[in-house]
Regions:
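H-loop/switch region of ABC-family ATPase nucleotide-binding domains
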Residues: 120-121
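Conserved beta-strand-loop-alpha-helix hinge in the C-terminal portion
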Residues: 138-165
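Conserved ABC ATPase "signature" region
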Residues: 41-59
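Hydrophobic anchor residue at the start of the ABC signature
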Residues: 77-78, 105
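ABC-family nucleotide-binding domains
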Residues: 98
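Conserved ABC ATPase signature
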Residues: 63-67, 71
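Catalytic Walker B motif of ABC-type/P-loop ATPase nucleotide-binding domains
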Residues: 88-91
């Protein structure tokens, strides 16, 4: 049943603008619990608690269209986590983020006990957040050795910022 699956798996879209549609952050995060049958007070409490857990306390009345890209991505994640899914499906969660926002996403994901399927081209990110890897070749999934997510220090030509992956 697709409805049952939607209640168990949270989807974080690549572009946060496609996921956020309410005027304020609190309304966006409370939308899911309201649709699950929570009262207004329960939905607001769950939303506020989730925002606090993600370091977004104080964002409740902020306008979603005025958030930075990283803030929008974190709020998108909050809209999913507030529903307490059994698993997460994340599509390119670090795409277009500044390094600080990327690190916040990594920090949040590393603390979650929730099973995750992450679609990403960012091997550094995958190395920090995942233990198993699959690659897509044509229409087939293939096990990727963890060596794809290797660890060594280097400097990217455009970033000129040493990091490990």
């Amino acid at each position: 049943d697709f409805r049952e699956l939607r209640c168990k798996v949270g989807l974080v879209l690549q572009h946060a603008e496609d996921q956020l549609f309410c005027p304020t952050v609190l309304e966006d995060v409370a939308f899911g619990p309201l649709n699950l049958g929570c009262t207004q007070d329960e939905a607001r409490d769950r939303a506020a608690s989730t925002l606090e857990r993600l370091g977004l306390a104080g964002f409740e009345n902020r306008l979603t269209h005025r958030l930075s890209g990283g803030e929008k991505k974190l709020v998108s994640l909050a809209t999913v986590l507030v529903m307490e899914p059994e698993a997460l499906l994340l599509d390119e969660p670090t795409n277009g983020l500044v390094p600080e926002a990327r690190q916040r996403i990594i920090g949040v994901l590393k603390t979650l006990p929730t099973a995750r399927i992450i679609i990403s081209h960012d091997w550094d990110f995958l190395a920090e957040t995942s233990s198993e890897y699959l690659t897509v070749e044509g229409q087939h999934f293939t096990d990727a050795a963890p060596s794809h997510a290797h660890a060594h220090m280097h400097v990217h030509p455009l970033g000129n910022k040493p990091h490990e992956h």
